[in-house]
């Protein structure tokens, strides 16, 4: 027996199906680029947050060592791009203090990276200003930069002083 649809039966015709697919395709072409933009903005924001967190933790370390009489920041990495890579992150910061590595300063046990898992560049330096008979003032500077070309925050950096 053949099943024949009755005139009043419910269902889609091919034309209705094609129109529905076309409308969904049009909507997706608008939504997907927006989603990609939102994702990139969120990754850039997370990268900036991670750079700021590193700065705050290193400044906390500086204040702790200052209270112990030997104020210093973790030294700049000596690799070509000054990256906070695993080798640098596992080196002891100062032999004069309790042996601590940069990784151990963070509660997660490792230095935060960018959204792509690439380490940030880090450098530190001092600037000494002589104040005449009042002595001198030493400013400690930190610069943290995202040097990953595939990162949405490429070349964004934070420079701060204590």
Question: What are the functions of these language-model segments?
Answer:
Residues 141-162:
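Low-complexity, S/T/G/P-rich flexible repeat/linker segments used as non-globular hinges
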Residues 1-6:
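N-terminal secretory signal peptides that target proteins for export/translocation
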Residues 12, 35, 61-62, 120-122:
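Aromatic side chains
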Residues 63-146:
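Extracellular/periplasmic head regions of type IV pilus-like filament subunits
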Residues 40-69:
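Membrane-proximal N-terminal amphipathic helix
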Residues 8-35:
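N-terminal single-pass transmembrane signal-anchor helix
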């Amino acid at each position: 027996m053949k099943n024949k649809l009755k005139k009043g039966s419910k269902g889609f015709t091919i034309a209705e199906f094609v129109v529905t697919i076309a409308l969904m395709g049009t909507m997706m072409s608008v939504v997907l680029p927006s989603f990609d933009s939102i994702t990139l903005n969120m990754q850039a924001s997370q990268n900036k947050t991670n750079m700021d967190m590193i700065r705050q933790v290193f400044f906390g370390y500086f204040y702790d060592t200052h209270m112990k009489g030997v104020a210093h920041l973790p030294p700049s990495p000596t690799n070509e791009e000054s990256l906070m890579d695993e080798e640098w992150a596992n080196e002891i910061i100062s032999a004069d203090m309790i042996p601590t590595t940069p990784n151990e300063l963070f509660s997660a046990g490792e230095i935060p990276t960018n959204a792509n898992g690439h380490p940030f560049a880090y450098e530190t330096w001092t600037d000494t200003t002589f104040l005449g008979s009042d002595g001198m003032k030493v400013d400690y500077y930190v610069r943290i930069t995202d040097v990953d070309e595939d990162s949405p925050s490429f070349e964004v950096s934070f420079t701060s002083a204590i």
